[in-house]
Amino acid sequence: MAIKKQMDLLGVIVLGLTTAIGGGIIRDVIIGVIPPSSVQDTIYAKVSIATSLLVFLVAYIYRDRPIKYSFKLVYNNLLLVSDSIGLGLFTVVGINAAYHRLNSPGFFLLVLVGVVTGVGGGLVRDIMAGDKPYIFVKHIYASASILGAIVCIYLWDISGQSIAMLAGTSTVFLIRFLAARFKLDLPIIQGHNFKE
C-alpha cells in the first residue's frame, strides 16, 4: 500500500511496522500490559522492518519492468494464503494473551482482543495512509476474525488451548480464504441517496 501511494522508504517501514505490531499494542493496552509486549520483545518489529526493506528493494528493482500475469497470480495467491493464516494466528494469539493475563476474562473481551490483535494494525495502517479501512469494505475480513475467535473461545475449556487455537486459526483461514477466492462480501447499501 505504501509503495502504491508513492511513500518513501520510511513510509513503507512505518506502515509495515504499524500493520505488524499495531493490533498487539492496542490489545496490550486493553488488557493492561504496559509497556506493550511488542515493544519489549522486538522480534516482530525486526521482522517487520526487514520485510518492509525487502519489499521496498524488490519494488525498486522492478519498478519499470512489466510484470507478467502469471507472476501477479502467484503473488496474489501467496499473499491471500499468508494473510489468511496470519489473521487467524494473530486472532488466537490475542485470545491467548487475554487468558494468560486476566482472571476469568469475559466472552466479549476475549472476542474483542482477538479481533483487535488480528485486524487492529491493518486498520491503523489504512487510516494513516488515508484510505477507508480494508476490513470494512473488502471481502469478509474482520468477520472471519470474529467467527474464528468465537470458535477458539468456545473450544478453549472443552478441548484445551492447543486444539482451540488450531480450530480458531483454521476457521479464520477457511472463511477468509473462501471469501476472497469467491469474492464474498457483506452486504452494503448502495444508491444515490447514500453517496458522499
Task: For the regions a language model picked out, list residue spans one by one.
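Loop-to-transmembrane alpha-helix initiation sites
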Residues: Q40-K46, G106, V137-I146, I158-T169
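Cytoplasmic-side transmembrane-helix entry/capping segments in multi-pass membrane proteins
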Residues: G11-T18, I43-K46, F71-G86, I135-A144
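Short, highly charged, low-complexity non-transmembrane loops/tails of multi-pass membrane proteins
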Residues: I189-E196
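The feature marks the first
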Residues: M1-A20, D28-I31
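Helix-coil boundary and interhelical linker segments in multi-pass alpha-helical membrane proteins
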Residues: V29-V39, V93-L109, Y154-A164
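Structural signature of hydrophobic alpha-helical transmembrane segments
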Residues: S38-L53, P105-G118
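C-terminal ends of transmembrane helices
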Residues: M1-K5, F56-L73, L123-P133, A179-P187
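Transmembrane alpha-helical segments of multi-pass membrane transport proteins and ion-pumping complexes
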Residues: A20-I21, I25-V29, S48-I61, L87-N96, ...
